[in-house]
Amino acid sequence: MHKNGISGHRIGYMNYLKNMRFLLQAITLLISVTTIGQKQRPNIIYMMSDDHGYQAISAYGYDLNKTPHIDKLAEEGVLFHRAFVTNSICGPSRAVMLTGKHSHINGFKDNHSTFDGSQQTVSKLFKNAGYQTAVVGKWHLVSEPQGFDYWNIVPGQGDYYNPDFIENGIRKRVPGYVTNLTTDFAINWLEKRDKSKPFFLIYQQKAPHRNWMPEPKYYHLFDSIQFPVPDNFFDDYKTRSSAATKQEMEIATDMHYAYDLKLAFDISEEQRKGLAGSWHSIFNRMTSSEKQIYKEAYQPSIDVFSKANLSGEQLAIWKYQRYMREYLRCVQSVDDNVGRLMDYLKANNLDKNTIVIYTSDQGFYLGEHGWFDKRWMYEESFRTPLIVKGPGIAKGKQTYSMVQNLDFAETLLHLAGLPIPTDMQGKSFVPVLKGKKGGHDALYYHFYENQEHRVAKHIGIRTARYKLIWFYELNEWELYDLETDKREMHNLYGKKEFAAIENMMKAQLSSLQQRYKDNTSPQLLR
């Protein structure tokens, strides 16, 4: 008997009831909070175009073209001036975004790889958390998408005109222009989705990937424009390592007359290079009426070119102008369709609770160093556009915090209030989106693929001021001071006055290799 006359059994039973009451209250509170969370969890649209260089977005301050719809995202969100990739090539960049892991960890090192879809991905994490998930447009990972309730993707690189799409495993040809069709499929899915759930949509455009086939309404856009030629267009690479002289991505010498420059319909040069079939397969996707419209648009410029008999620097500049017009025409359709998708969100009252990310799989050369394409750790391909807007995100801000596509998965999960797996290798930049400090002090890069364009394999590190690149199969180094040499024209490696910086950067590079578990010849870093 208890001293107050109450039995111990009675006290135990009363404590049991008390504990149960607290437990029921806690469960009720948890259910209530979860329900509120379900209603308030943000929708997320991840927009990624293919090879869209930051130079071709007017919000970045360049005068090449106007992108009003992408610019509006920047006006309503945060624009990053220092967003970079880990491996500047299409498929690997996508795999990094999906996994939050470097290429040597996720297994997709180059465009000849096949993505292991059984591994953990951000789409699976969103789906498991109750989000409805979809991916439309460019995929480029060979294996079928996993972790998506719906997918509708172009096979491989896809085609611009009357492309094939694979919808949940069923392949069919769809009439129309690929950039518009990708948006059609995205909007159609948004219309039909389960509206009781938040959604996570990956919306990936093929454009403006090579070979830059514009939408017919833009065939004559920029016809009267002469674009400024970059001041290092005729770069002789004398101050760089031998890697720069061995590449095959120069506008002057490596663009194909039919495939790239649309100088078919005399394709003897392409036959010699074995590319005539590539051009014909693209052109023959058009209907007869589409071919006629195309010929009427392009034949006059082909005739002018044939009569001009250009050579040397004049020919190189003509190719540059042709390339820029075609590339920027494709960008114009991308911007139009960003506007279409944003208009849909607003018309359906989804804009207030949807986070929108706009980026590219990497940067792209628009004549800098005389190049097209990507791959290098030099700024134009290493750096990528990044704009983020949505609830809780600062508006109209620009930041120079250094972030990387390695951070995207963690940032998306953080924005949705979801747990971040400990094996991801990035760092959420949500603090930056809220106007606080964040990002990285140093970034690690590793490029593996040297088959196409003959760009040597390399690793490197970038800090706020310096960049160190090691072409490890050549055992050649480059060091740049990005404050005094933004164009990366003067290799400082081996100069006595920079020996201390070399050693510091090598030590940091070795540290990053250890952190990310990349064991590429670490002994040579000593």
Language-model-derived ranges and their functions:
Residues 1-40:
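Bacterial Sec-dependent N-terminal signal peptides
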Residues 483:
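Residues forming the ATP-binding cleft of Hanks-type serine/threonine protein kinase domains
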